[in-house]
Amino acid sequence: VIYQSAERVRGRNYPATNGFFKVCVISHLRPEKDPLRTAMAARRLPSSSRVRVLHIGRPLSDAMARQVRAETARNPRFCWLGELSHARTRQVLANSQLLSVTSRMEGSSNALSEAIASSVPVVASKISGLMGTLGRDYPGYFPVGQTGALTQLLDKIESNPDFYRRLKAHCARLRPLVEPKRERAAWRELLAELE
């Protein structure tokens, strides 16, 4: 297996006791990414929650553009940032407390590798492409499309520092998988086998 690598970007991603608990979503808005699932889950959180969902990505259809504008208007926990440069996206991620990957189907995602490289823990839909990187025993999964389960998971992560540290430690153990030198070595090995 060749894991997509990512350089580390340093940020301040430990939860502040007096600020927002920032949950980053990095996804162009298209149905297979289930892009507004995190925003919908955040709407159901208790009023005391400090969760703010920061969504980076552009809508790929008029219908998705209407949906994201409607979500922005009705959800005070949701901040749609639109399409940002790669460098700016990486900085927003590095300064977030959590990455949420809600895809219905995909291989592993660039954002997942970038989160792991930058020590940002992840909540993820339980699909094979993401499990291939995070492992079967990762405690931050929720069933695909299950808003209630994601709400419960977000609430637990925000309110239980031990659980948050457990996710962070699990992702830290995965960091060697996404080191650029490891990816380069894996490609060299594969290409040598093909010669």
What are these regions (language model features)?
Residues 162-192:
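A charged, aromatic-enriched C-terminal amphipathic alpha-helix characteristic of glycosyltransferases
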